């Protein structure tokens, strides 16, 4: 991304923002409410248009046919409204629509993705009766299923017999409705995707979760990246005070050695 700029009325949402997302890395995007975090994800996905340049997997965003790009990039929004009485497994199956892998393969993938989010027992439950956290996990399974692909796509060809091309997974506050164990399960799953070679971008508000799981943290404020680096480099008491207006204590846990913010 180069020089992304987006203005709504008199409000500058993104201002000359430049950023590279790297394969094999879990990047956490932090910032106060209303600073453009969700907007940035929508610009990357193509849902919103901004001035500037966005390239996906080395190609201009505009050159990617939507059905092909859907096999390489998936986004989990903050909320996903769905009022139809689908079963949970049918919601996850929506992630397979860009593919032509066949019913048998899709069923295996759907089951695997439900297991990845700890929701296999919900497979035959009606989506509309699930709790908010359960719905969030089902939609996470859906985007995982969307990226589960044994072949690789490029703008020029429908299929190429290579399995190494990275994908882009974007998650907008994926832990907001989850209990403690499922928060960690979700981020551990995202972390595994990064370890497998994908680029993963996650919006969080919990600084301790960010410190624990991020390879890289981006701090967004006033439409610009204010800091970019490791958790240790970005999450300093001075910077937290500056951006979040909060006097935080930042230290390493004496037993685990993990960075901790309180």
From Swiss-Prot:
Domain of life: Bacteria
Keywords: ATP-binding, Cell inner membrane, Cell membrane, Membrane, Nucleotide-binding, Translocase, Transport
Domain ABC transporter: 1-247
Location of the protein in the cell: Cell inner membrane
SMART domains: AAA (SM00382)
Any coiled-coil regions, as ranges: none
Keyword RNA-binding (UniProt): no
Residues the entry annotates as binding ATP: 31-38
GO molecular function, one term: ATP binding
EC number(s) from the headed UniProt entry: 7.6.2.-
Membrane topology: Peripheral membrane protein
Homology family: Belongs to the ABC transporter superfamily. Heme (hemin) importer (TC 3.A.1.14.5) family.
Physiological role: Part of the ABC transporter complex HmuTUV involved in hemin import. Responsible for energy coupling to the transport system.
Assembly information from the UniProt record: The complex is composed of two ATP-binding proteins (HmuV), two transmembrane proteins (HmuU) and a solute-binding protein (HmuT).
Protein name: Hemin import ATP-binding protein HmuV
Organism, scientific name: Plesiomonas shigelloides
């Amino acid at each position: 991304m180069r020089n992304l700029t987006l203005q709504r009325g008199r409000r500058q949402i993104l201002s000359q923002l430049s950023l590279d997302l790297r394969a094999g890395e879990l990047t956490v995007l932090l910032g106060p409410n209303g600073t453009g975090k969700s907007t940035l994800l929508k610009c990357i996905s193509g849902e919103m248009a901004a001035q500037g340049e966005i390239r996906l997997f080395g190609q201009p965003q505009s050159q990617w046919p939507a059905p092909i790009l859907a096999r390489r990039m998936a986004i989990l929004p903050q909320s996903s409204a769905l009022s139809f009485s689908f079963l949970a497994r049918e919601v996850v199956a929506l992630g397979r629509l860009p593919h032509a892998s066949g019913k048998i393969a899709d069923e295996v993938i759907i089951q695997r993705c439900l297991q990845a989010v700890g929701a296999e027992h919900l497979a035959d439950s009606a989506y509309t009766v699930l709790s908010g956290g359960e719905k969030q996990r089902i939609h996470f399974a859906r985007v995982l299923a969307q990226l589960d692909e044994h072949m690789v796509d490029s703008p020029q060809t429908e299929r190429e017999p290579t399995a190494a091309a990275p994908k882009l997974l974007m998650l907008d506050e994926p832990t907001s409705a989850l209990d403690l164990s499922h928060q960690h399960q979700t981020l551990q799953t995202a972390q595994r995707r990064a370890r497998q070679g994908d680029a993963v971008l996650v919006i969080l508000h919990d600084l301790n979760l960010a410190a624990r799981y991020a390879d890289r943290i981006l701090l967004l404020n006033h439409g610009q990246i204010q800091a970019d680096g490791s958790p240790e480099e970005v999450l300093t008491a001075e910077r937290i005070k500056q951006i979040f207006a909060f006097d935080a204590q930042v230290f390493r846990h004496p037993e685990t050695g993990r960075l901790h913010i309180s």
